[in-house]
Amino acid sequence: MASGCKIGPSILNSDLANLGAECLRMLDSGADYLHLDVMDGHFVPNITFGHPVVESLRKQLGQDPFFDMHMMVSKPEQWVKPMAVAGANQYTFHLEATENPGALIKDIRENGMKVGLAIKPGTSVEYLAPWANQIDMALVMTVEPGFGGQKFMEDMMPKVHWLRTQFPSLDIEVDGGVGPDTVHKCAEAGANMIVSGSAIMRSEDPRSVINLLRNVCSEAAQKRSLDR
């Protein structure tokens, strides 16, 4: 089976002038991991930050927090080693951004990180299938990547369901427009790693939102287990 349900706040919607404090606030509120969006202005139109910021966060937050790097970059091969040195735990690259996923997967592992593989909404999930047994996590985007605060795309749920059916032990992450009103759809389809940005970051009580998301996800996982 996939690992248990985990909630990873996306810091894209945080106060970037106080990024370290915002990350600490999320961890203190019960976040299982931090989802860090790296954008280069080429693969997606927005620009965020790179490995120097990740290195600074690692120094401030210590070794315990799990950094899930969502690499929305046109040359993911270029940043594997810098991110590993900076303290990243998982390197999630986009299938659309490389011509040689196998070599990239190997390089990520050799640099001591877990491997995530992401697909945009317009990419068929079957293209991910040949690599599913070589990765730790599949990320199904539920918005067009590049900006936070977008509307959840429910028509991505068949991709999640197909992956869960075909690869029961794979960690499956959803990212984009996920919050209390949409998490049940993701969980019922089979997602066990939930990225949520605005719903958590802008809440006056982020702990309660994180707990709600985790509980919905866990209940759906238990139901799938009983239904088998």
From Swiss-Prot:
Binding site for substrate: 10, 70, 146-149, 175-177, 197-198
CDD domains: RPE
EC number: 5.1.3.1
Annotated positions of the N-acetylalanine modification: 2
Reaction equation(s) it catalyzes: D-ribulose 5-phosphate = D-xylulose 5-phosphate
Pathway: Carbohydrate degradation
SUPFAM superfamilies: Ribulose-phoshate binding barrel
A Pfam family assignment: Ribul_P_3_epim
Gene Ontology cellular-component terms listed: cytosol; extracellular exosome
Protein role: Catalyzes the reversible epimerization of D-ribulose 5-phosphate to D-xylulose 5-phosphate.
Cofactors that this protein relies on: Fe(2+); Mn(2+); Zn(2+); Co(2+)
Keyword Iron appears in the UniProt entry: yes
Annotated Gene3D superfamilies: Aldolase class I (3.20.20.70)
Cofactor mode of binding and number, as noted: Binds 1 divalent metal cation per subunit. Active with Fe(2+), and probably also with Mn(2+), Zn(2+) and Co(2+).
Stated consequence of mutating residue 141 to A: No effect on enzyme activity
Keyword line: Acetylation, Carbohydrate metabolism, Cobalt, Iron, Isomerase, Manganese, Metal-binding, Zinc
Family of this protein: Belongs to the ribulose-phosphate 3-epimerase family.
Quaternary structure and partners: Homodimer.
Organism domain of life: Eukaryota
Protein name according to UniProt: Ribulose-phosphate 3-epimerase
Stored NCBIfam families: PRK05581.1-4, rpe
Any GO BP: carbohydrate metabolic process
InterPro entries cross-referenced by the UniProt entry: Aldolase_TIM, Ribul_P_3_epim, Ribul_P_3_epim-like, RibuloseP-bd_barrel
Catalytic residues as annotated in Swiss-Prot or TrEMBL: 37 (proton acceptor), 175 (proton donor)
Entry annotated with the keyword Acetylation: yes
